[in-house]
């Protein structure tokens, strides 16, 4: 390294001397002005003035010579620069593995050939993946046609009509609807009011008709017992209204008629007579209520004078 630096110093000095000599030997320009221009720049045309303003090139050339001398003192840097640029294929970073080193040593033609098989391999891997996916889809969708065939075969064996096949292939949601349809179509009496529905409506009317008859019979029994209790009591006689007297006298003949005529006509006569008696008793009750309501109303706090 030291010898290279020593050689560089005299070369720099010789270069500076040659440059000064060239500047001194420049021919005069046609414009009769001295020009300090390097030797390689000569006047091309006699009319043009190549000279710069002032004599400012002398110190610049001197500075260049000094810089060249200083650069000769750095042997390590100059030695690396003089050797020239090295081939890029030999420079390999340590971070890369042996595979990258081998690729750097190989020529570019082989690298391109290697990259092409890698791209084709990646394309083949993608195509194989797509092929596998297609196989999976086919395997998943394959059982569907046998199911249709198995569903259509029993319909043919059972002798069903072809339009019934969609009902067989339908889902659970459509299997529930025909049940209600069959119930409505096969049993139309459920949608109409039959005899069974009409009977309960007729029964309350008959019960309402029988209830007042029973109430009338009970009233008659009480009215018959009241005069007997009044007659047998110790001087306690209850006043009886006049319309009740003939009713008490008419009861024995009714009983005799029932005993004499045990047929269906006797029951009809008894029911007719009971209805007439009930009407009379209800009329008596109405008269009593009207008599009470017709009485003069008296304030509760005022004394009543007769």
From Swiss-Prot:
Cited Pfam families: DUF4691 (PF15762)
Biased composition (Basic residues): 129-139
Family annotation (InterPro entries): DUF4691
Region annotation Disordered: where it falls in the sequence: 40-156
Top-rank taxon, per record: Eukaryota
Low complexity composition-biased segments: 64-73
Protein name: Uncharacterized protein C16orf86 homolog
